[in-house]
């Protein structure tokens, strides 16, 4: 522990990092009982502190801190650590290591704002949720170069250790930062980067000057500029965090050889791409979508073809769309500037935005199912056109690729049909893939920008990744995250084991090493090894027919019961189903495997991917080039190194990335940081125990403690152990001789009764198992208690012995004295003794005389010295009196200062309290505002959802209308076909038999081909399995090249053979399938034509019936609409009448208010005149009280302003709330209307579906009949002649039916014309209705405007009243001379207030009268229908007025926009000038850098030139050597010539040799020429290389120039961010200066009060006079207080009046409810009329009882249901039931018709035997039954029409009640405003009361100061008197002695 002086270097951060010395000493001296102080388990708090009271039978009874007594088991009790371990910095050093000790240590440190704590190798950080001063530059420099144990825990300490290890060990480092979302991972990552950037740039002070212009914060600035881009595309709002990173990242910061920053790069992991298409309710998608739609850049909206409403796009509007803490507009500008800074080109920027917009459009693409097919088709192409345009694709190709993708089968491509759901899944997968690939591409581009190309040697990696996740629903994403954390924990355990091993090895400890990294091996192998979860998942993904169930079954077969980590979860109520559980180190997690196969495959539509690759957008094509390459590689090589590269699953890719990460981490020295969320509510200082414990388990802190406990976690140096625990057995260590500390510790531990296996001796330390040190501490405490007791006993014995010894000595001395006295008494009468007594004094007389003389001399001397001393004493006394006087004066002054200081402190405390109260109020108001905003957001979301549903319903209605039109067209077509088909009927009868035979034969052949196809598929599957095995063998046998070649040749031969077989099989199957398809199509055509022939006639009859019904329904609808229009007109008249009455009332009230305002203004004028008269008197008073009132007045004003603002905010919020409630009610009405429309549509849909089903049944029956006819034709071929005659009869009947069909079609055409005419009339009525609704809306708007004017008048009145109260308060301070006048004026004002209140009450009574009139007008509403036209004219006038007002508003808006534009232009010019200045400064900096870099390049070029010159010199030397060789050859030539001259005799031989030598010379010359040419060529190449190098250097210079420009841009951006931060800092400094000014003002007040007190002490008489004046003022204030009290009572009276008005409003509400009741009675009368109509219907139905028994029963049930119904909703339901019964009756009738048809068929058979008459009778009976059915259906339609009419009546009544409720709400608003006035009056009274209290406190204070001054004067006077008395006494004593 360092001292407070050592901590001074941390500055203001010191108290947030380490305890002070005082706290440490207090903790060590705190009383503590190790046996009784424990933690016990608690169900609420997890663990609580307690004191053990008893232990019995394995149970412990303890008393908690809260006073509760609990009894728990022994294993739920945990011992507490001694107080010296409180707030310990490294939790691994605690005596007792367990969960509650860790929890409470973290909690106590967090309460003291020490957020960083070590736990062994971990650094645990708790999110403070507020700013702490622990990251400033002072702290950075303090941690620089410090070891871990030398400084308090901090993220800077971890960073500095990593940096120092990198420099000293020359090893890469890594910092692993994990934790849940919102725990502070990203913030700590930024702090790490900040630290490295600071120390690495300013690290080498010797070269500081040289590097000052190069890398000053460059890396940090670049990463900061990358952050907005990464956060925009990778961050989103979650439940816990508004800006949560939805991806992990590993940031590598590279350093050069000297430790300077070199470059950086980023790797990302596990981007949550599912968020692109799906979000939870409380979350939202990635920020970029909402930034674009914030409309900060309108050109983006136009470019992307989108709107600014997120609810228009399904992918981004499933959750919330706004975040209060994020400004999307500012974030968009930051993102846009980051794109520029990071060097993206303009095309790339546009591509990024376009791809983002395309993803949004993908979510709006609609598809529907084709009729009679499962094939999907586009439902509109508008959205697809936009998406394709943004991606530079062809819209038709895109839609075709989505609905009809091409699939490769063998070597051919086949078009495959897609269902609607499959298409939607494909669209979602494409959107996610585009977004993910774009994000990864942006990361790659950022890395290219961050790579500065500087030399780098080592790096420090910072891993920011999500922690362990255990949710209620855990899917594949959670398994990946948890598996990552499992691997990281294994890595930590192994690393910790290695460190422990090194420690034990260094200390020479014998220990059985356990690799704790293997503890997690079982779980990891279960997931990643062969036949593990991932392996099985990937295997299942390869099988086409695999499902989630088959995957689950395989998991169970493979692992259930075989692995302890794999379990089957127990079903829990209320939770999502779980399929299997895994036992992780952090707990057991239940996983749900739904959709894992699809997630893992993550299939993409390959056809669309092909379109992407061919896109004209380069970025999109580049993003998907890798996909094509992978396919080519997978398809072409078939046996490369990367197996299955064309089919890489998500899990395989994840494992590959994870393995790379683990490889990186294993190559580094790791440091671990764990981030903790203290609570879910983001409250600073609060900690939730269960939440923190869950995180400690999940992030491995408790796992690390477990590993510590397995070894020897506690370790102490021998010297420290000997010194502390020697007391346990001091005899074990011999005294008086030297002994080594290690031997002493061994002897000491050997002599103590402890388990000797629980400790080990190292070279320098003794190591203990967990808990043993605590046991030694307890033994030491017991031993110390014994020793202290023994010491106390010895001390008490020693003191008793000393006392006894004194008593014995006293007794002996007494005995001696008694003996001597007795002896003297015996000898005093002896004569010799008497002589001795007489002589003895005479012997000393001479000596006494001498002594007397000496004494006289001494007396004289002392007398002189006394006189001198007396003189000195007098002087000193005088000085003392003067000093005492000064002392008293100083004491009085100090006392006065202390009093004034106390007063100032009291005032300061009061100010702080008021500030806290105001802050609390502000917080409450902001919370309320946030709640209201949340409610508003929910309502708007609901509104959007309803609008979407409404639009969907409209689309459904449009679709139904389209289908109806299609059906009508088909009907016309089929009418033409019927004629043709009747002619072809005879021919088709003959061909049917042949076709059926052919069909059977084809079916058999089709079955045979299916069997063959299945066999071929089995073969293909076996072949694919064999192929995969062979590919595995190829991958495994890469070691030897020769074997691989042989195996590859064999495999290729087998593959070619198999492919040939496969092609043949596929070709044969394709041929068979084509034949089969052709035959099926022919067969379907024939069957379809046959079924059409039989069914079209019946369809046409049913259609004619339906059209007749529709005509009747539309006629009824027209009547109903006419009735509705009449009712609407009546309600309009009523509403207009009410509006005119209300407007008259508002005008009267406004006139009254103006009168009151005139009175108050006249009163104000009088007050101003009086003010002018009293100006002089008031100045004198203000000068006297200015200094005392200044601070109070400012505070009052601030308080009043803040209260007024809060009140206004509350009023605004209430108004917003009321508006929202109105909108809510209107939305509810719309919901009801939509629900009713939905019901009608669903009923119509159900009817259509029933009709379809019946038609299908009829078709099937006709098919069966067709087969029977076929058999009859085959059986009765002999009777063909007779049948021909019968066929003539049938043809006649067919002609009759044709004529009937033509008649029906003509009737249908007439009906369609009528329908169109009715539709046109209906549209006209709807238009008229909408015009009326618009008029009503405008009238409401006028009413709202009038209401707002009224509110403004009310506010003006309140302002006047506040001014009046201020004038009253000023008048009250005037002299008593004018008090009576002021009182009279206030009384007059009060009378005016009373009059105003009376007028308001009259107005309220008038409102009541108006409501009564409304009730009477309700009864006479029929008479007011004639006034509708006049009201419509008024409405038009009001509309014109509104239009004029709107025009004025638009003009004003235009002027405002122009001024805004001017402001923006001037602001832009200012920014441009600032930018210019910055660019000039940066250009200067750039030129300097360029100059330095050019100098460096010049030096490098010089060095390269030297090297080239050296090479040239070498070449010239070689040429010189060649010249020497030539010279030597010339010498040889000369010698040969000499020999020639000498040997002329042998001329021929010499000539031959000469020729030979010349040949040699020629060859040598040739060689020399070749050498020369080679040298020339090399020189030319070198010249070219030099030129190439020059060009390369020029390019490098250009690239460096571009990077320098990018750096300058990033630096400018950083400067901008820095300026922004400086602006924030300036604001904070302004706040600080404001606080300092407040303190300085308080100090000035204190000094002023000091001066005032000095004046009062100097002038007591003036103070007395001032006291009298203050008494007079007090009397005046009391009178004013009485007046205010009377005013408060009057305000209470007005409050009671408002209460009465509220009751009146409630009475009006009751009247409205009575009116509703009256309407209800009218409704019941209508119901009675409806019942009468229904009885008529039942009578008509009664006529059919003999024909249809079921219809009569249904009608009786309907009667019973109608009579039993009590409520309107039940009657509607019963009516629906009756309609359903009638529908069933219709079905029954249709069934009877079918039965009759069957009988008719039988009759036809009988007719063969001669029964034609019977057939005719049956046909007549059938026609009668059909007519009856038709009449019954008509009656049913009429009943439904009446039911709908009553439903509309109910809606009208509900609408009327809603209008009444709105009127009540308006009255309630009026009451609320009156209450607000009352509150303002109360507030004024409170302000006056506060002012009186302040004056009273000032008076009391001055009176108290006066009394104290009098007391001090009395005390001083008494002290002076005492001193005088004393001086007199001394003087008298001196005189008497003289």
From Swiss-Prot:
Annotated coiled-coil segments of the chain: 845-1926
Renumbered residue ranges of the record's region Actin-binding: 658-680, 760-774
GO MF term list: actin filament binding; ATP binding; calmodulin binding; microfilament motor activity
Gene Ontology BP annotations: muscle contraction
Domain IQ positions: 784-813
Phosphothreonine found at: 64, 69, 419, 1240, 1254, 1264, 1285, 1466, 1500, 1516, 1729, 1735
Keywords: Actin-binding, ATP-binding, Calmodulin-binding, Coiled coil, Cytoplasm, Methylation, Motor protein, Muscle protein, Myosin, Nucleotide-binding, Phosphoprotein, Thick filament
Modified residues (Phosphoserine): 36, 392, 1091, 1095, 1161, 1236, 1242, 1260, 1277, 1287, 1291, 1302, 1305, 1473, 1494, 1513, 1541, 1553, 1573, 1599, 1602, 1713, 1725, 1738
Protein location: Cytoplasm, Myofibril
Residues noted as binding ATP in the record, renumbered to the chain: 179-186
Any Pfam family matching the protein: Myosin_tail_1
Domain observations: The rodlike tail sequence is highly repetitive, showing cycles of a 28-residue repeat pattern composed of 4 heptapeptides, characteristic for alpha-helical coiled coils.
Subunit structure: Muscle myosin is a hexameric protein that consists of 2 heavy chain subunits (MHC), 2 alkali light chain subunits (MLC) and 2 regulatory light chain subunits (MLC-2).
Stated name of the protein: Myosin-4
Organism: Oryctolagus cuniculus
Gene that specifies this protein: MYH4
């Amino acid at each position: 522990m360092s001292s407070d002086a050592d901590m001074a270097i941390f500055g203001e951060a010191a108290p947030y990092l380490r305890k002070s010395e005082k706290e440490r000493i207090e903790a060590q001296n705190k009383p503590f009982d190790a046996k009784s102080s424990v933690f016990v388990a608690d169900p609420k708090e997890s663990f609580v502190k307690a004191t053990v009271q008893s232990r019995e039978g394995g149970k412990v009874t303890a008393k908690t801190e809260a006073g509760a007594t609990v009894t728990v088991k022994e294993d739920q009790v945990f011992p507490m650590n001694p107080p010296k371990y409180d707030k310990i910095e490294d939790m691994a050093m605690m005596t007792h290591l367990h969960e509650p000790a860790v929890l409470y240590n973290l909690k106590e440190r967090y309460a003291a704002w020490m957020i960083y704590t070590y736990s062994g190798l971990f650094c645990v950080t708790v999110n403070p949720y507020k700013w702490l001063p622990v990251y400033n530059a002072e702290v950075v420099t303090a941690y620089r170069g410090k070891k871990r144990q030398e400084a308090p825990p901090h993220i800077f300490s971890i960073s500095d250790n990593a940096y120092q290890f990198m420099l000293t060990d020359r090893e890469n480092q890594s910092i692993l930062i994990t934790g849940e979302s919102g725990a502070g991972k990203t913030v700590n990552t930024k702090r790490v980067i900040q630290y490295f950037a600071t120390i690495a740039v300013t690290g080498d002070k010797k070269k500081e000057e040289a590097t000052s212009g190069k890398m000053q914060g460059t890396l940090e600035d670049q990463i900061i500029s990358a952050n907005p881009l990464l956060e925009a595309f990778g961050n989103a709002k979650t439940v816990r965090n508004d800006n949560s990173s939805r991806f992990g990242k590993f940031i590598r910061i590279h350093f050069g050889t000297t430790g300077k920053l070199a470059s950086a790069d980023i790797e990302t992991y596990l981007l949550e791409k599912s968020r692109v298409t799906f979000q939870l309710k409380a979350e939202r998608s990635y920020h970029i979508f909402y930034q674009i739609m914030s409309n900060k850049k309108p050109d983006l909206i136009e470019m992307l073809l989108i709107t600014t409403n997120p609810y228009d796009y399904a992918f981004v509007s499933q959750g919330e769309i706004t975040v209060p803490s994020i400004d999307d507009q500012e974030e968009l500008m930051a993102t846009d500037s980051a794109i520029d800074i990071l060097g993206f080109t303009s095309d790339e920027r546009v591509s990024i935005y376009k791809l983002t917009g395309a993803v949004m459009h993908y979510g709006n693409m609609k598809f529907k199912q084709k009729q009679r097919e499962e094939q999907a088709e586009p439902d509109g192409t508008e959205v697809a056109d936009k998406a394709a345009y943004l991606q530079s694709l062809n819209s038709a190709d895109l839609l075709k690729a989505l609905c009809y993708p091409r699939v490769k089968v063998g070597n051919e491509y086949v078009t495959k049909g897609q269902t609607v759901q499959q298409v939607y899944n494909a669209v979602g997968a494409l959107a996610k893939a585009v977004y993910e690939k774009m994000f990864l591409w942006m990361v790659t581009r950022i890395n290219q920008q961050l790579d500065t190309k500087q030399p780098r040697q080592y790096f420090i990696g910072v891993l920011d990744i999500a922690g362990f996740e255990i949710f209620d629903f855990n899917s594949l994403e959670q398994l990946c995250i948890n598996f990552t954390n499992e691997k990281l924990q294994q890595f930590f355990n192994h690393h910790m084991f290695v460190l422990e091993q090194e420690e034990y090895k260094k200390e020479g400890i014998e220990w059985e090493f356990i690799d704790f990294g293997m503890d997690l091996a079982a779980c990891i192998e279960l997931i990643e090894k062969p036949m593990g979860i991932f392996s099985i998942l990937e295997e299942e993904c390869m099988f086409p027919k695999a499902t989630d169930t088959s995957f689950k079954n395989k998991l169970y077969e493979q692992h259930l019961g075989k692995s302890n980590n794999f379990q089957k979860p127990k079903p829990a109520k209320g939770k999502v189903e779980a399929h299997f559980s895994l036992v992780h180190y952090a707990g057991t997690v239940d996983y749900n495997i739904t959709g894992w196969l699809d997630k893992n495959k993550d299939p993409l539509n390959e056809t669309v991917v092909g379109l992407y690759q061919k896109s004209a957008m380069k970025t999109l094509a580049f993003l998907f080039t890798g996909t094509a390459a992978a396919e080519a590689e997978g398809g072409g090589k078939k046996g490369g190194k990367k197996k299955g590269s064309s089919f890489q699953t998500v899990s395989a890719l994840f494992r590959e990335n994870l393995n790379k990460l683990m490889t990186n981490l294993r190559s580094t020295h790791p440091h671990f940081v764990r981030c903790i969320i203290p609570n879910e509510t983001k409250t600073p200082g609060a900690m939730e125990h269960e939440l923190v414990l869950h995180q400690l388990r999940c992030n491995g802190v408790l796992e690390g403690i477990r590993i510590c406990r397995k070894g020897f976690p506690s370790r102490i140096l021998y010297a420290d152990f000997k010194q502390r625990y020697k007391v346990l057995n001091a005899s074990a260590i011999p005294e008086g001789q030297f002994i080594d500390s290690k031997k002493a510790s061994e002897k000491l531990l050997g002599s103590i009764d402890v388990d000797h296996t629980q400790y080990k001796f190292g070279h320098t330390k003794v190591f203990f198992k967990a808990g043993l040190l605590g046991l030694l501490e307890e033994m030491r405490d017991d031993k110390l208690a014994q020793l202290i007791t023994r010491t106390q006993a010895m001390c008490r014995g020693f003191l008793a012995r000393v006392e006894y010894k004194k008593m014995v000595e006293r007794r002996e001395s007494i005995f001696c004295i008694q003996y001597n006295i007795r002896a003297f008494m015996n000898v005093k009468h002896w004569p010799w003794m008497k002589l001795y007594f007489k002589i003895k004094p005479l012997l000393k007389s001479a000596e006494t005389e001498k002594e007397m003389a000496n004494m006289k001399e001494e007396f004289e001397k002392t007398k002189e010295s006394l006189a001198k001393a007396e003189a000195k004493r007098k002087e000193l006394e005088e000085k003392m009196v003067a000093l005492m006087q000064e002392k008293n004066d100083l004491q009085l002054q100090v006392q006065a200062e202390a009093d004034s200081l106390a007063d100032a402190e009291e005032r300061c405390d009061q100010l702080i309290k008021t500030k806290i109260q105001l802050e609390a109020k502000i917080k409450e108001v902001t919370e309320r505002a946030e709640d209201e905003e949340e409610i508003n957001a929910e309502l708007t979301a609901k509104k959007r959802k309803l609008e979407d549903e409404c639009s969907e319903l409209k689309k459904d209605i449009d679709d139904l209308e389209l289908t109806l039109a299609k059906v009508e067209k088909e009907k016309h077509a089929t009418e033409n076909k019927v004629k043709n088909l009747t002619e072809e009927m005879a021919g088709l009868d003959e061909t049917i038999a042949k076709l059926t035979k052919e069909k059977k034969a084809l079916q058999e052949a089709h079955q045979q081909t299916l069997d063959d196809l299945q066999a071929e598929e089995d073969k293909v599957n076996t072949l694919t399995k064999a192929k995969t095995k062979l590919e595995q063998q190829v991958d495994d046998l890469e070691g030897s090249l020769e074997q691989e070649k042989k195996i590859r040749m064999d495999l290729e031969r087998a593959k070619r053979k198999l492919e040939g077989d496969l092609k043949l099989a596929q070709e044969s199957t394709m041929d068979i399938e084509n034949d089969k398809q052709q035959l099926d199509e022919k067969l379907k055509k024939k069957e379809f034509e046959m079924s059409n022939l039989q069914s079209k006639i019946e369809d046409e009859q049913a259609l004619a019936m339906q059209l007749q019904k529709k005509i009747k329904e539309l006629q009824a609808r027209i009547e109903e609409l006419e009735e509705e229009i009449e009712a609407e007109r009546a309600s309009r008249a009523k509403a207009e009448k009410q509006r005119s009455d209300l407007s008259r009332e508002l005008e009267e009230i406004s006139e009254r208010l103006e009168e009151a305002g005139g009175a108050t203004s006249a009163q104000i004028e009088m007050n101003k005149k009086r003010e002018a008269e009293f100006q002089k008197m008031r100045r004198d008073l203000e000068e006297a009280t200015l200094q005392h009132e200044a601070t109070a007045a400012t505070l009052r004003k601030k308080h009043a302003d803040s209260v007024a603002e809060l009140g206004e905010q509350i009023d605004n919020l209430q108004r917003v709330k009321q508006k929202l409630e109105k909108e809510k009610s209107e939305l509810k009405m719309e919901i009801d209307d939509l629900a009713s429309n939905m019901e009608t549509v669903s009923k119509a849909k159900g009817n259509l579906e029933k009709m379809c089903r019946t038609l299908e049944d009829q078709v099937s029956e006709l098919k069966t009949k067709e087969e029977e006819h076929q058999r009859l034709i085959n059986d009765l071929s002999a009777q063909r002649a007779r049948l021909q005659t019968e066929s003539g009869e049938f043809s006649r009947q067919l002609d009759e039916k044709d004529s009937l069909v033509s008649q029906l079609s003509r009737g249908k055409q007439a009906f369609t014309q009528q329908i169109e005419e009715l539709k046109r009339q209906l549209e006209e009525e709807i238009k008229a209705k909408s015009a009326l609704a618009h008029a009503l809306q405008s009238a409401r708007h006028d009413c709202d405007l009038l209401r707002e004017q009224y509110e403004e008048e009310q506010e003006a009145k309140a302002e006047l009243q506040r001014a009046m109260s201020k004038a009253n308060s000023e008048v009250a301070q005037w002299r008593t001379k004018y008090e009576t006048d002021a009182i009279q004026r206030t009384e007059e004002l009060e009378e005016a207030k009373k009059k105003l209140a009376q007028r308001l009450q009259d107005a309220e009574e008038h409102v009541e009268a108006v409501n009564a009139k409304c009730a009477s007008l309700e009864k006479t509403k029929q008479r007011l229908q004639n006034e509708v036209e006049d009201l419509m004219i008024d409405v038009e006038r009001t509309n014109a007025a509104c239009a004029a007002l709107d025009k004025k508003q638009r003009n004003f808006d235009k002027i405002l926009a122009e001024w805004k534009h001017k402001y923006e232009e001037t602001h832009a010019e200012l920014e441009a000038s600032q930018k210019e200045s910055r660019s000039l400064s940066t250009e200067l900096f750039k030129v300097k850098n360029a100059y330095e870099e050019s100098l460096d390049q010049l030096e490098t070029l010089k060095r390269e030139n030297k090297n080239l010159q050296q090479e040239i010199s070498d070449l010239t030397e070689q040429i010189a050597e060649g010249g020497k060789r030539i010279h030597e050859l010339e010498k040889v030539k000369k010698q040969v010539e000499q020999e020639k001259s000498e040997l002329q005799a042998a001329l021929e031989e010499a000539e031959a040799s000469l020729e030979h030598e010349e040949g040699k010379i020629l060859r040598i010359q040739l060689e020399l020429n070749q050498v020369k040419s080679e040298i020339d060529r090399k020189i030319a190449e070198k010249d070219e290389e030099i030129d190439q190098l020059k060009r390369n250097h020029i390019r490098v210079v250009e690239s460096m120039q571009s990077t320098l420009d990018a750096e300058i841009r990033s630096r400018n951006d950083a400067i901008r961010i820095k300026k922004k931060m400086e602006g924030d800092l300036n604001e904070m400094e302004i706040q600080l200066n404001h606080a300092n000014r407040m303190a300085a003002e308080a100090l000035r007040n204190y000094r002023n009060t000091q001066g005032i007190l000095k004046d009062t002490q100097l002038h007591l008489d003036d103070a007395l006079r001032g006291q009298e004046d203050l008494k007079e003022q007090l009397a005046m204030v009391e009178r004013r207080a009485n007046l205010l009290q009377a005013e408060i009572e009057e305000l209470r009276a007005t409050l009671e009046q408002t209460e009465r008005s509220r009751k009146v409003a409630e009475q009006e509400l009751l009247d409205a409810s009575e009116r509703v009741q009256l309407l209800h009675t009218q409704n019941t009368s209508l119901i009675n009329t409806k019942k009468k109509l229904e009885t008529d219907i039942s009578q008509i139905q009664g006529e059919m009882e003999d024909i249809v028994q079921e219809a009569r029963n249904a009608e009786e049930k309907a009667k019973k249901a109608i009579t039993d119904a009590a409520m309107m909703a039940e009657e509607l339901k019963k009516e629906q039931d009756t309609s359903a019964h009638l529908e069933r009756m219709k079905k029954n009738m249709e069934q009877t018709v079918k039965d009759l048809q069957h009988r008719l068929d039988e009759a036809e058979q009988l007719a063969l035997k001669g029964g034609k008459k019977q057939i005719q009778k049956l046909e007549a009976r059938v026609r009668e039954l059909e007519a009856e059915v038709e009449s019954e259906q008509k009656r049913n339609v009429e009943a439904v029409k009446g039911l709908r009419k009553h439903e509309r009546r109910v809606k009208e009544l509900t609408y009327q009640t809603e209008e009444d409720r709105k009127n009540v709400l308006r009255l309630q608003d009026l009451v609320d405003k009156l209450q607000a006035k009352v509150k303002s009056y109360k507030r004024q009274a409170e302000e006056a009361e506060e002012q009186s209290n302040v004056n009273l406190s000032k008076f009391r204070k001055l009176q108290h100061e006066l009394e104290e001054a009098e007391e001090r004067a009395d005390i001083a006077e008494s002290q002076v008197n005492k001193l005088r008395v004393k001086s007199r006494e001394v003087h008298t004593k001196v005189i008497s002695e003289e």
